[in-house]
From Swiss-Prot:
InterPro entries: Calcineurin-like_PHP_ApaH (IPR004843), Metallo-depent_PP-like (IPR029052). It comes from Mycobacterium phage D29. Coiled coil: none annotated. This is Gene 54 protein. GO terms for molecular function: hydrolase activity. The gene is 54. It holds the Pfam family Metallophos.
Length: 255
């Protein structure tokens, strides 16, 4: 019996594309996959960002309301339609409140656990697991957000995941880049071969809300990923969101 895993990335709430996120949650409810993995940057948390240090945004007091938005728009709707395993990688944006406390308020570090994203978002209450930095998501595959492990980031789709695959020596699925792409590589000799795969799953962020782009259009692609697992057979698949819709197995979901 095959197993299906839905992998989503970089919602960066409150800068998520609300219609896309709602449609993907609906897809999960309709198809009931065996596992859901959010590969990181569930949250953006702009106020404690190093990019807003010294600006009015630093004093906006958004951490709590932004966390409540994530519960209202993602975690609660997801749990209303799906009771299977949900795991979340910690992305670089997710840990901004925790890092800010350590860097700028060391006298309060004893309270640091309260600023971890899993506590701000009540993962225990929603039955959500924090995944290890490198998670064995399927036979011969690991998932990781993509910002650690010495991975070199590039501006071309799939190339960052490809760099991770070569560095780690295993098939890899990542987020972080906001791009979609799949890129394999074959090693071997004398007709014997070993094929590894690298995959970047895209994002569910509203690019118009990314103020740091300053009106530019980034090389980002909206969508998510799927892994279909049957024993040691693993099929990676991208699901792009284009023209207000996406399709899986011949069925179409409207955004």
């Amino acid at each position: 019996m095959s197993k299906r895993i839905v992998v989503i990335s970089d919602t960066q709430i409150p800068f998520d594309d609300r219609k896309q996120l709602k449609a993907v949650v609906g897809f999960i409810g309709d198809t009931q996959p065996d596992e859901v993995v959010h590969i990181g940057d569930l949250m953006d948390y702009p106020s404690p960002s190093r990019w807003t240090k010294g600006s009015s945004e630093e004093f906006a007091q958004r951490i709590k309301p932004d966390s409540e938005q994530a519960k209202t728009r993602f975690l609660a709707p997801l749990r209303a339609v799906y009771d299977g395993p949900v795991g979340v990688h910690e992305g670089n944006h997710d840990r901004r409140p925790f890092d800010y406390l350590h860097k700028f308020a060391p006298a309060l570090v004893e309270y640091a656990d309260q600023f971890k994203f899993e506590n701000l978002l009540d993962f225990d209450g929603f039955g959500v697991t924090v995944l290890p930095e490198f998670y064995k998501v399927a036979p011969g595959w690991i998932s990781t957000h993509g910002h650690r492990g010495g991975v070199r980031v590039t501006q071309k789709s799939a190339d960052t995941a490809y760099n991770a695959m070569q560095r780690f020596g295993t098939s890899v699925i990542i987020g972080h880049t906001h791009r979609q792409g799949i890129k394999p590589h074959t090693w071997g000799y004398g007709g014997h071969q070993k094929v590894l795969w690298s995959m970047e799953v895209g994002n569910l962020m509203n690019m118009k809300l990314a103020q740091y782009l300053k009106g530019a259009t980034a090389n980002w692609q909206s969508g998510f990923g799927l892994l279909t697992v049957d024993g040691n057979h693993v099929k990676p698949e991208l699901v792009p969101i284009v023209g207000g819709r996406f399709s899986v197995d011949g069925h179409v979901w409207e955004v």
